[in-house]
Amino acid sequence: MTLITRRSVLGAAVLTAAVPVVADHDRAIAADADIDLAGWTLLGVGDEFTDPTHSSAQWHRGLWYPHSGSGLFRDANVSFSGGQLHLAARAEQVDSFSYTFGAVESVFDVPGLCTYVEVRAKALPSAARVLSAIWMQSSALDGGPSLLTGAEPNPELDVEETFDYTKMNIATHVWPDNTEVTHRRFGGHAYPVGVDISRDYHTYGVERRDGKLRFYFDRHLAWETKPGDPSLWRMSRHMVLSLEGHLGAPVVHRLPASFDIDYVRAWYAPNPALEPGDYRLTSADGRFLAFHDGVPTLQAQPQTWCVVRHDDCTYSLSTPGGAVLGLDA
């Protein structure tokens, strides 16, 4: 039997009346639009920042670009203490830069499909005018300038960037060649939260499944979107936490200051109701999905399909002869 690994058949030519190829999971959103993690599995990836030695090995200091605006990334601006990760912004002259920033990229992958990833953090104080960023992207962890080879189109999820401290500012991109020439922006959303987020700790989360991205502020749904590229909801990514110079010159007398991260956690979605096995797939009018002369069709006579679940939470349908719907049909 022909199987597919780590490949969705979302693009398969499935007839409208047939059962969807990708299982329709129960939504993780309760009636009040908050995510409900009951039944989800907390994964071992992430960091609670309770062990500085362990955390230091989990995070690469610096990014694949050496500076952001007038701020130079420095390893010394990254510290682990008090059960937290601290990224500092300082007014100090280093080379031609008047400021220094902290930034880290995880050495571990945050899984993609069928997951919810959450960061609890307190943004650097708004009065200092240094942007705090929570995002997902993967580099080679060698200081740059390239993103991870073989991970094209290099999807990027900006979960929060403090362009406006009273909003959760979200954006999505892909960087196929890691250049502006091929860079594609798919838009974003600014979700008003009604408070200055830098005054307290908040959670920032993203759920990736069912072909959708769902972003959460304090576990309240902030934005749901069908991304412009499937890699945005499928591919694993590194977690990036950084200070950026996108707000212009920092306010010197408000520095030093820090962006404080309490934890990074990831959950895996509850198992779907559909179990692997042999099925007959019917349409609303009682006809059966069948494979005839190399073409999927609806007919009166039933045909058995083998449903196979893959490790990325997708499914494939194959005939007894081994033809896979979406690949061979």
Predicted features and spans:
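N-terminal secretory signal peptides and thylakoid transit peptides that target proteins
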Residues: M1-T16
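GH16 jelly-roll
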Residues: V9, D32-P272
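C-terminal region of N-terminal signal peptides and the immediate post-cleavage residues
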Residues: V19-A33
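Short, flexible N-terminal segments of the mature chain
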Residues: P66-H67, R265, H292-P302
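Short small/polar-residue motifs
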Residues: G69-S79, R287, A300-V307
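Beta-strand residues in well-ordered beta-sheet regions across diverse protein folds
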Residues: A88, R120, Y216, T282, ...
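Extracellular glycan-recognition/adhesion modules and their associated mucin-like linkers
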Residues: P272-G294, T304-A329
